[in-house]
């Protein structure tokens, strides 16, 4: 397979810019797509070419139109499409459309995506691969008598989860049978609106849980590497707030066990490209339970890049071109991948912590970001004069701090956040600063409920 000359990025905001930067460094031209409501988005201007999509479709529907993405790819002469995260990144129909039109999809095969992108079928894969899973139902039907019976068999408390997509959408904690029907219907509506598919299932809720995930890369020759783990336990309403690599509370034996579990699942389906295998860790007994596989690049991939030195997006591109993992990572084998230091990422958003984190909109009248040793910024519309609209998510920029130790990385992140000056819209910066100083966080005693219960 020949190297790509032009890559269309089927996304927007910071991840589109991140992908374009990776492609630029490799000498590849880039193509952006943008909805009318997103015409001032920086990703449009970062690309070598930009095309408007989705006339009359709406601000999000435009980015979800496979026909429009393929149309622009053909018009622009792009030979590959990178989906980023969110939007169409987990839709196997886009992969099929790429194959039908002679365009390479930078990501897993469609059959892999169908097996792993749906959380319910991913559970079956995990069970086949002899990886522990949390007790759960199959995909729920419409018979609420049957649902009530299944829920009672597993036992409360339960978590309703959407089969497709992520980001906390469609998820609902259910503490008892009186809440069951209302929460299931509520979660279905939210999942349908977010992903176009309302399917969901019930899962036993682990009370004191950590959220850890393993970064995987697989090539077309059948090789699988892991890039170690990330801790994503600090969440608010199932949305990640702080991500870390490596997880500071794991022993070397636990780290080895966890990473091998992640590798086993991906090896079982001959996984290609980048993926993340997510687990819950029970703090009381140290056991790991499979949650899902995200068949795409993650928002928090930056922390793994900082501690391994491997550019995950460039690796995705090279794997899609047919190159081996050793070529894509610069590492001859799994044993050559070493952890170096500690990194954490925080997400600066235009949410107002003083008003129940409601997203704020408007024009940024002043903007100054952090800089200095060990600080990395991945931003979208983060500049003075930029307009934050109500149509898209509230992420302003991602801040990643690296240092030799967790303590120094946290101190560096705190310093960086204090350097920010944002006027015109509210941000969550003060909230994150306080979080980083909390004794529970500093002592590594936090669970996934840390923020919600503090």
Short names for language-model regions:
Residues 136-137:
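Conserved beta3 strand of the protein kinase N-lobe
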Residues 149-159:
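Acidic/histidine-enriched active-site and ligand-binding environments that engage anionic O-linkages
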Residues 1-129, 141-149:
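ATP-binding N-terminal substructure of ATP-dependent carboxylate-amine bond-forming enzymes
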Residues 2-3, 8-26, 30, 50-52, ...:
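ATP-dependent carboxylate activation and anion-phosphoryl transfer catalytic cores
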